[in-house]
Amino acid sequence: MIIAVDVDGGDYAPKEIIKGALKAAQEYKIGLILLGKKEVIHVHAGHYLKKLPIEIVHCPQTVTFNEHAVEAIKGKPQSAIVIGTSLVKQGKADAFISAGNTGAVLAAAFFILGKIDGVERPALGAIITTRPHIPSLLIDAGANAECRPNHLDEFAHLGNIYAKQVLGLENPRIGLLNNGEEEAKGTKLTLETHQLLKKSKLNFIGNIEGHDISLNKADVIVTDGFTGNIVLKTLEGLGDALLKVRKVGHAIDSAAHLRGRALLADVGLGSMVKGMDFEECGGACLLGVKGTIIVAHGRSHARAIKNAIGLAKRTAEKGVDKLIAEDIKSRTKAGTEGDPKNVNTPV
């Protein structure tokens, strides 16, 4: 297993990216291709370059966060984002991760890897854990701001396969994020999407509201990318706020040990904070393209990068992109939606 890593992208690049990548190489026993300025990588990786299976690919160009995605990809062919995606296309890397310009990463994936046949809109699937050890998938988490009902229906099918393979769920519960549980409530988009999902062979449980996310009512939360990204950022902000509250509580109780209910409350809060910490998962997977692409958070530190690489490894090992292609072929061949349970996707 070889993972290509963009060491130029992110608020804390290259030091934290390289640090996280080295930890991943040691923990997951994988090979790495580090993409960036060769001399900089040598400075931060040091003697690990001789101890670990690491290859360096010099990338003289860098895509910044404020650049237009398509223009950056076309104008900077020697950037880590373009070269890393190309390595996946060529079969020289099993996956590529970047904490850089998200739009540029998506554009590179679309233009270089291409969409899986039958997929109209690839989407970002982000794993969220609002309850200890009970993950769910939010899709779309930011790739498509404007969507049609058939796009959300497509997201549900993409998320269903990912939840089976990566989250290990046998029959994922699919929920449509809406402003009410009632079938007759919502916008034109959610009303029409509801009918499509209702007719599907997915385990569609109906509409879910915002508060249902933290209660883990659904395993796959389906929404458009604009709403999904706001939800994701809100959860991240809440996690940061809870962490600050917990730190203040520890400072107040520094003179005495927590006991009884106070201790239980602290443990519970700690579990919740950990679950809502974006660094726990590491990144979001771009589903619907021919290859494994993980988009890490721009403010990722070493732990987030290590975990993003772990996610890339699990996703690539499961061959999620190939299973998505099989699922589409199966449903197309049937001439109807077909039952995703019949696709050979062992958990």
Curated annotation (Swiss-Prot):
The keyword Transferase belongs to this UniProt entry's keyword annotation: yes
Subcellular location field: Cytoplasm
EC code(s) of this entry: 2.3.1.274
Keywords per UniProt: Cytoplasm, Lipid biosynthesis, Lipid metabolism, Phospholipid biosynthesis, Phospholipid metabolism, Transferase
Chain segments annotated as transmembrane: none
Function: Catalyzes the reversible formation of acyl-phosphate (acyl-PO(4)) from acyl-[acyl-carrier-protein] (acyl-ACP). This enzyme utilizes acyl-ACP as fatty acyl donor, but not acyl-CoA.
Protein name from the UniProt record: Phosphate acyltransferase
Species this chain originates from: Dehalococcoides mccartyi (strain ATCC BAA-2100 / JCM 16839 / KCTC 5957 / BAV1)
Lineage: Bacteria, Bacillati, Chloroflexota, Dehalococcoidia, Dehalococcoidales
Gene name of the record: plsX
